[in-house]
Curated annotation (Swiss-Prot):
This is Argininosuccinate lyase. 2-(N(omega)-L-arginino)succinate binds at S27, N114, T159, N289, Y321, Q326, K329. Catalyzes the reversible cleavage of L-argininosuccinate to fumarate and L-arginine, an intermediate step reaction in the urea cycle mostly providing for hepatic nitrogen detoxification into excretable urea as well as de novo L-arginine synthesis in nonhepatic tissues. Essential regulator of intracellular and extracellular L-arginine pools. Its EC number is 4.3.2.1. Pfam families: ASL_C2, Lyase_1. Enzyme activity is regulated by acetylation. The modification N6-acetyllysine is found at K7, K69, K288. GO terms for biological process: arginine biosynthetic process via ornithine; L-arginine biosynthetic process; positive regulation of nitric oxide biosynthetic process; urea cycle.
Length: 464
C-alpha cells in the first residue's frame, strides 16, 4: 500500500518531495479522465487475484464493493482528491483504503502502475474509438444523403483553383465522403490494435503469482493478450496510430472546409452557411464569417502537433517504461475532444448548408468544355494528342477573336480540322458533358448513383 507520504512508491525514500517537483510530476489533473476504466481494470484484477488464491472470496467481495463505492463517488462528483493523489491510480487506491481498510493493500499484488495505466488507457481509447466511429459514420451518412438529394445540380470543378470541367455538386460531396470512409475504416483497424490486454505484465518481467491473463482478458473483453511484458508496458504504437488517424482525418476535413470557405465567399457565392455555424464582426455589420469551417481548418494543426509531439517523445526512449510516457494521455484526451467536436460541427454544417443553384450554373462557361471538344474529335477517329492540340487551337482562336469557345462558327472550326461537323453543337451542352463520364467513379448520374450505393454499403459493412 502507500507509504506514510501517501505515495505508492515511497518506501525507500527519506524526506519530502520538493513541492515544485510534486506539481511537475503529478498527472491527476488530466488522467482523472481514466477514473471509470481504472476501477473497471481493478475489479477485473481482483477477480484474477481471487482465482490465483491471493485473495479470499470475502476479500474480493470487499474490494469489489469498495470499488463500486469509489466509482459512485466519481459519477456523482463527490470524490474528494487529496494533495498526495499524484495520479488516478493513487487517488482510487487511497480512497479504497479509506473505505475498506488494509484489505485494499492486496489489490496491487503483482500489479505495477506500468501495466495498470496502459490497460486503463487502452480501455478508455477503445470506447473513444467506438464513439468517434459513430460520429464519423453520421457525418458520412449526412453527406451521402445530401449527394443523393442534389444529384442534378451542376457546378464547376477546379484544379489548381482554376475552373476545369463541369461536374455534379454531388460528385464533389462524394469525393470528400469517400475519403472519410477510409478514415472510418482506418479507425476500426486502430481500435482492433488497441483492443489487446497488457494487464498482468507487471513492471517489466511479467507476473510471478499465477494470475490468469486469459481470465483478465475475458473480464475486460479484450480481443487478445500482449505477447511480451517489456513491450506491453512501454509501447505506445496504438497511441501514435490513433493520433495519426486523427491527423489524416483532420487533413480531409480541413480540405473540405477550405473548399466550402471559398464557395461561400461573394466571389463564388455557391453556398451559404447557416447562421447556426457562422459569426459576425464586432466592427463590420455586413460580415458573416465561416468560423465553424475556419476552426475545423485550424484545429487540424493542433492535432498534427500532438501527433508529432508524441513521436518526438517516443523516438529516444530506452527500453520499457519511462516517465516520458506520461505525456501520451494529454495528447489522447485533447485530440479525442477535438475530433468529437469537429465531427459534430462538420455534420451540422453539411446538414444545414444552403446551395445557390443559379450561381453554380452561371459559373459554368464554354471554355470548360475544351476537353469535351477534344473528345468529340477522338470519337471521329483522331488520336487524342492531335485532338488535344486541335482543341487548344480552337481555344486560342476564340481568345484572339474575343468570343466564347461555343461562338466559333462551324467554318472557323473546320479550318482547324475537317472532322468538325454540324453535330459539334452537342458539345456545348453542360448536361451532355457530365453524362459522358459514365465510367465507374465519374460524374455521370449513373456513376454518382453507383458511388452512393457503394458508400452506403461500406458503412453497413463497417457497422456490422
Amino acid at each position: 500500500m502507500a507509504s506514510e507520504s501517501g505515495k505508492l512508491w515511497g518506501g525507500r525514500f527519506v524526506g519530502a518531495v520538493d513541492p515544485i517537483m510534486e506539481k511537475f510530476n503529478a498527472s491527476i489533473a488530466y488522467d482523472r479522465h481514466l477514473w471509470e476504466v481504472d476501477v473497471q481494470g481493478s475489479k477485473a484484477y481482483s477477480r484474477g487475484l481471487e482465482k490465483a488464491g491471493l485473495l479470499t472470496k470475502a476479500e474480493m467481495d470487499q474490494i469489489l464493493h469498495g470499488l463500486d463505492k469509489v466509482a459512485e463517488e466519481w459519477a456523482q462528483c463527490t470524490f474528494k482528491l487529496s494533495p498526495n493523489d499524484e495520479d488516478i491510480h493513487t487517488a482510487n487506491e487511497r480512497r479504497l483504503k479509506e473505505l475498506i481498510g488494509e484489505t485494499a493493500g492486496k489489490l496491487h499484488t503483482g500489479r505495477s502502475r506500468n501495466d495498470q495505466v496502459v490497460t486503463d488507457l487502452r480501455l478508455w481509447m477503445r470506447q473513444t474509438c467506438s464513439t468517434l466511429s459513430g460520429l464519423l459514420w453520421e457525418l458520412i451518412r449526412t453527406m451521402v444523403d445530401r449527394a443523393e438529394a442534389e444529384r442534378d445540380v451542376l457546378f464547376p470543378g477546379y484544379t489548381h483553383l482554376q475552373r476545369a470541367q463541369p461536374i455534379r455538386w454531388s460528385h464533389w460531396i462524394l469525393s470528400h465522403a469517400v475519403a472519410l470512409t477510409r478514415d472510418s475504416e482506418r479507425l476500426l483497424e486502430v481500435r482492433k490494435r488497441i483492443n489487446v490486454l497488457p494487464l498482468g505484465s507487471g513492471a517489466i518481467a511479467g507476473n510471478p503469482l499465477s494470475v490468469d491473463r486469459e481470465l483478465l482478458r475475458a473480464e475486460l473483453n479484450f480481443g487478445a493478450i500482449t505477447l511480451n511484458s517489456m513491450d506491453a508496458t512501454s509501447e505506445r504504437d496504438f497511441v501514435a496510430e490513433f493520433l495519426f488517424w486523427a491527423s489524416l482525418c483532420m487533413t480531409h476535413l480541413s480540405r473540405m472546409a477550405e473548399d466550402l470557405i471559398l464557395y461561400c465567399t461573394k466571389e463564388f457565392s455557391f453556398v451559404q452557411l447557416s447562421d447556426a455555424y457562422s459569426t459576425g464582426s464586432s466592427l463590420m455589420p455586413q460580415k458573416k464569417n465561416p468560423d465553424s469551417l475556419e476552426l475545423i481548418r485550424s484545429k487540424a494543426g493542433r492535432v498534427f502537433g500532438r501527433c508529432a509531439g508524441l513521436l518526438m517523445t517516443l523516438k529516444g526512449l530506452p527500453s520499457t517504461y519511462n516517465k516520458d510516457l506520461q505525456e501520451d494521455k494529454e495528447a489522447v484526451f485533447e485530440v479525442s475532444d477535438t475530433m468529437s467536436a469537429v465531427l459534430q460541427v462538420a455534420t451540422g454544417v453539411i446538414s444545414t448548408l444552403q446551395i445557390h443553384r443559379e450561381n453554380m450554373g452561371q459559373a459554368l462557361s464554354p471554355d470548360m468544355l475544351a476537353t469535351d471538344l477534344a473528345y468529340y474529335l477522338v470519337r471521329k477517329g483522331m488520336p487524342f494528342r492531335q485532338a488535344h492540340e486541335a482543341s487548344g487551337k480552337a481555344v486560342f482562336m476564340a481568345e484572339t477573336k474575343g468570343v466564347a469557345l461555343n461562338e466559333l462558327s462551324l467554318q472557323e472550326l473546320q479550318t482547324i480540322s475537317p472532322l468538325f461537323s454540324g453535330d459539334v453543337s452537342c458539345v456545348w451542352d453542360y448536361g451532355h458533358s457530365v453524362e459522358q463520364y459514365g465510367a465507374l467513379g465519374g460524374t455521370a448520374r449513373s456513376s454518382v448513383d453507383w458511388q452512393i450505393r457503394q458508400v452506403r454499403a461500406l458503412l453497413q459493412t463497417q457497422q456490422a
